[in-house]
From Swiss-Prot:
This is Xylose import ATP-binding protein XylG. It comes from the Bacteria. Part of the ABC transporter complex XylFGH involved in xylose import. Responsible for energy coupling to the transport system. The complex is composed of two ATP-binding proteins (XylG), two transmembrane proteins (XylH) and a solute-binding protein (XylF). Belongs to the ABC transporter superfamily. Xylose importer (TC 3.A.1.2.4) family. It holds the Pfam family ABC_tran. It is a peripheral membrane protein. Keywords: ATP-binding, Cell inner membrane, Cell membrane, Membrane, Nucleotide-binding, Repeat, Sugar transport, Translocase, Transport. The gene is xylG. One of its GO terms (cellular component) is plasma membrane. Its EC number is 7.5.2.10. SMART domains: AAA (SM00382). It comes from Pseudomonas syringae pv. tomato (strain ATCC BAA-871 / DC3000). PROSITE patterns: ABC_TRANSPORTER_1 (PS00211), ABC_TRANSPORTER_2 (PS50893), XYLG (PS51280). Gene3D superfamilies: P-loop containing nucleotide triphosphate hydrolases (3.40.50.300).
């Protein structure tokens, strides 16, 4: 019998004559966690779709050996029956069903006559959650009553209930808090000890380093290297991923900061479900021409609610004023905001940033169709010219602008959303989690773009949950806590500890602000 549970040998997958995978080899032993690393568009998701039979046997070349025997699965149900289970970045739970019902979906236990055996399902679900160290979870409650971290564990329980021997985790921590991530990594270590193998796909390389035994890197559809994690470090992984050394993830190009161009006055947002509760409480701040303002805070602090209100996209009731060039402007809808010179790249690009049924190019020009309108028709040649320029400027990887945008990787979808907003020629650009789910190479390109836009005089507001990112690219940092402004810092030798201390402080406390706060006379961007 082979030492390997899984062997993928010489995998080739072609789309319209283009090789998305070109001879990739991957091997996984029982109880081993293999980190699958690569930039967006490198082929990671395509490879996992081959393995899980989303692309069935016969639609690709090469061979898959499972326990030393050829695997020629034609459907996901066949691979799951073999013990290969994938947990996607977007959870597949049904919110209104109970935890137990979600765990047994498609594999329900029944009594004679076909009735559901709910007591048996609840007992088994409770056993699974205890194994995952969540003994107090009420598996009879709707899964929607639990947060993202617990829902991720329900997905793992669902996989274990299918007798998973190989667990594929695709960006499993993208919506989790730091503490939830620690729980997840601990559970993966426990599963490894029980002989369950894992393939871990994540752009968060610190997680990859913490949980993986082996690193396999692919680039442009080709296998670059497979190395024991003990012989690797994060800079080496990055070098293999991007094909070049990156001495500094955050660009250090200086840019001048001008006069105040934007002002938010007394922004207050009320909870959608509880209109008496304030999600954002009377926040005011200014923004200068060419300035990059980072907004930091803990999960639930109100950062997304704040910027959504500024752009006119907050779904609940809100109040306050937005001023541009010393004059109040109407930003009560996204269209009015765009016309005023304010645009936003939203946090949830799949639901709010793209139209899935449209092509890449159509998504890029969606916000500026008036620019190409001639009476009752669109000037297709002019539109395509703009699309090609944006694809080139954004280094967007696509075989054709006419392909569905859903055919792109997450990072390239994000570049398309950015291109769409930049075609509006904004004076103020809001970026909400702009690099979430984006690989390290694409992150660097986005940071470079932000610096170039700031150098052109565009004022930028960036919300990010990654403190290193906030400190790496921002000129100034606002800290939000429990819906209120807790700190306003010039980013000069500012530390993550100072930002966290402000986020955890009570707004208005003397200690919640650094002495440098509100000192906005520093017109040169810090260098890192």
């Amino acid at each position: 019998m082979s030492d390997y549970l899984l062997q993928m040998n010489g995998i080739v997958k072609t789309f319209d004559g283009v090789k998305a995978l070109n001879g990739i080899d991957i091997k996984v032993r029982p109880g081993e966690c293999v980190g699958l690393c690569g930039e967006n568009g490198a082929g990671k998701s395509t490879l996992m779709k081959v393995l899980s039979a989303v692309y069935p046997y016969g639609t690709w070349e090469g061979e898959i050996l499972w326990d030393g025997n050829p695997l020629k699965a034609q459907s996901i149900s066949e691979t799951e029956a073999a013990g290969i289970v994938i947990i996607h970045q977007e959870l597949t739970l049904v919110p209104d069903l109970s935890v137990a019902e979600n765990i047994f979906m498609g594999h329900e236990l029944t009594l004679r006559g076909g009735r559901m055996n709910y007591p048996a399902m609840i007992h088994r679900a409770e056993t699974l959650m205890r194994e995952l160290k969540v003994p107090d979870m009420n598996v009879a409650l709707p899964v929607s009553q639990y947060g993202g971290g617990h829902q991720q564990l329900v997905e793992i329980a669902k996989a274990l209930n299918k007798q998973a021997r190989l667990l594929i985790l695709d960006e499993p921590s993208s919506a989790l808090t730091r503490s939830e991530i620690e729980v997840l990594l601990g559970i993966i270590h426990d599963l490894k000890a029980k002989g369950v193998a894992c393939v871990y796909i994540s752009h968060k390389l610190d997680e990859v380093a913490a949980v993986c035994d082996t690193i396999s890197v692919i680039r442009d559809g080709k296998h670059i290297a497979t190395t024991a994690m003990a012989e690797m470090d994060i800079p080496k992984i990055i070098t293999q991923m991007v094909g070049r050394e990156m001495s500094n993830l955050y660009p250090t190009d200086a840019h001048d900061i001008g006069e105040v161009i934007f002002e938010a006055r007394n922004i207050t947002c009320y909870d959608v479900d509880n209109p008496k509760r304030k999600r954002v409480d009377d926040i005011s701040f200014v923004l200068k021409r060419g300035e990059i303002l980072g907004i930091a805070g803990l999960v639930g602090a109100g950062r997304t609610e704040l910027v959504s209100a500024l752009f006119g996209a907050y779904p609940g009731r809100y109040s306050g004023e937005v001023w541009l060039d010393g004059q109040p402007v109407d930003t009560r809808t996204p269209l009015k905001s765009i016309r005023a010179g304010l645009c936003m790249v939203p946090e949830d690009r799949k639901r709010q940033g793209i139209i899935p049924d449209m092509g890449v190019g159509q998504n890029i020009t969606l916000a500026v169709l008036d620019n190409y309108s001639k009476m009752t028709r669109i000037d297709a040649e002019a539109e395509l010219g703009s699309i090609d320029r944006e694809i080139s400027r954004m280094h967007l990887k696509t075989a054709s602008p006419f392909l569905p945008i859903t055919s792109l990787s997450g990072g390239n979808q994000q570049k398309a959303v950015l291109a769409k907003m930049l075609l509006t020629r904004p004076r103020v650009l809001i970026l909400d989690e702009p690099t979430r789910g984006v690989d390290v190479g694409a992150k660097y390109e986005i940071y470079k773009l932000m610096g170039a836009l700031a150098a052109e005089g565009v004022a930028i507001i960036m919300v990010s949950s990654e403190l290193a990112e906030v400190l790496g690219v921002s000129d100034r940092v606002l800290v939000i806590g429990e819906g209120r402004l807790c700190g306003d810092f010039i980013n000069h030798e500012l530390t993550q500890e100072q930002v966290l201390a402000a986020a955890l402080s009570h707004p208005g406390d003397p200690d919640s602000n650094d002495p440098a706060n509100n000192n906005h006379n520093d017109n040169d961007r810090k260098t890192t």
